[in-house]
């Protein structure tokens, strides 16, 4: 598969263009049942190496999102992806950006899951429980307020 993002004379990318191009490629790979694929890293005007890396990871992780846990037991599609042609001097920075982007995408997926849950499953108490669980799993602190705490902050 080859994705051409812009005409050569318009070689200035927006991050969202790259995310969408990668996501389309991932969706096509899923249709074709391809589990291993490569993405050729191309430096573009307007995006730094970290921005390009982040966009690639977001496109990969978010393309396969579906909230269908009540419909079937289908697994989330996530192929093995290799990024080729990256500048050697930027590899360490890219590794760091890949992990950051994975964490970002996981947070986006969690938010999408929470928004898509029906109200008889996700009500204030269960939302608080899930927030605490996410905090423990990801290493951040969660403070759950009761109604009295909330009223104190409204003054």
Residue ranges and their predicted role:
Residues 1-155:
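Short amphipathic alpha-helical segment within the helicase RecA-like ATPase core
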């Amino acid at each position: 598969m080859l994705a051409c993002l812009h005409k050569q004379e318009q070689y200035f990318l927006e991050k969202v263009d790259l995310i969408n191009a990668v996501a389309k490629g991932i969706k096509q790979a899923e249709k074709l049942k391809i589990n291993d694929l490569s993405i050729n890293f191309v430096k573009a005007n307007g995006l730094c190496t970290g921005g390009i890396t982040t966009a690639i990871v977001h496109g990969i992780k978010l393309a396969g999102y579906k909230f269908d846990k009540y419909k079937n037991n289908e697994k989330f599609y996530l192929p093995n992806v290799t990024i080729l042609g990256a500048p050697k001097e930027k590899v360490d920075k890219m590794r760091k950006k890949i992990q950051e982007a994975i964490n970002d995408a996981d947070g986006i997926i969690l938010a999408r899951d929470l928004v898509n849950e029906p109200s008889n499953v996700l009500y204030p108490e269960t939302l608080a429980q899930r927030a605490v669980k996410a905090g423990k799993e990801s290493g951040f602190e969660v403070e759950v307020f009761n109604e009295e705490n909330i009223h104190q902050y409204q003054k």
